[in-house]
From Swiss-Prot:
Function in brief: IF-3 binds to the 30S ribosomal subunit and shifts the equilibrium between 70S ribosomes and their 50S and 30S subunits in favor of the free subunits, thus enhancing the availability of 30S subunits on which protein synthesis initiation begins.
Family classification: Belongs to the IF-3 family.
Name this protein carries in UniProt: Translation initiation factor IF-3
Name of the encoding gene: infC
GO molecular function terms listed in the Swiss-Prot or TrEMBL record: ribosome binding; translation initiation factor activity
UniProt entry tagged with the keyword Protein biosynthesis: yes
Subunit note: Monomer.
Length: 202
């Protein structure tokens, strides 16, 4: 089984600080936006006097650009941003279910419910209509099934483009819609509560 290739990770941002800055002079950008080229040793002393660190932010510039800041707080902020970025970039998996042009109502409802559940969990889904043997002559039934499925999943997703044929298979993709899912979840919770109240009355 072929392993999924993981996406390349961005290198963690690190800065040279105080004594790690080995160049003779640096360009210091002050909080008011002004800049000055001064000796590195002098810049470090100025930062220390303010209870701050001299941080090299543009090492490739000539001379390197530095600013005075609290390195611990800066690194904490960078780490937090990195964690947030990783959460947002978490890949969604693709779930697939297969149908046939003559899929009966029970089977259709069963599979559509599974696709809906996949979407509610944030997964992208693909529905494939498989045409076996001479059933390829019923392409219109395949398209009708896709339209029914699109309507059924519209409360939690958006269809990606138009359905496409590849050989004897008709593919259609759906992506989860967070706002729709939130509304759908609230509606389900309301219906469940109403049902519980009704049962309690009886």
């Amino acid at each position: 089984m072929r392993k999924k290739r993981s996406a390349p990770q961005k290198p963690k941002v690190t800065y040279r600080v105080n004594g790690q800055i080995r160049v003779p002079e640096v360009r210091v950008v002050f909080k008011d936006g002004s800049q000055e080229i001064i000796k590195t040793s002098q810049a470090i002393k100025m930062a220390e006097q303010e209870g701050l660190d001299l941080i090299e932010v543009q090492p490739t510039a000539t001379p390197p650009v530095c600013k005075m800041d609290n390195y611990g707080k800066l690194q904490y902020k960078l780490d937090k941003n990195d964690r947030d970025r990783k959460k947002k970039s978490k890949p969604t998996s693709l779930k697939e279910l297969r149908f046939h042009p003559n899929t009966d109502k029970h089977d259709f409802d069963f599979k559509a419910a599974h696709l809906e559940e996949f979407l509610r969990k944030g997964n992208r889904v693909r529905a494939t209509v498989v045409f076996l043997g001479r059933s390829i002559i019923y392409k219109d039934k395949g398209y009708e099934l896709v339209e029914r499925l699109t309507e059924r999943l519209s409360t939690v997703s958006n269809r990606e483009g138009s359905p496409k044929f590849e050989g004897k298979k008709l593919f259609v993709y759906f992506e989860p819609d967070k706002k729709k899912i939130e509304v759908h979840e609230r509606m389900l919770a309301k219906m469940k509560k109403e049902q519980q109240n009704k049962e309690a009355e009886n």
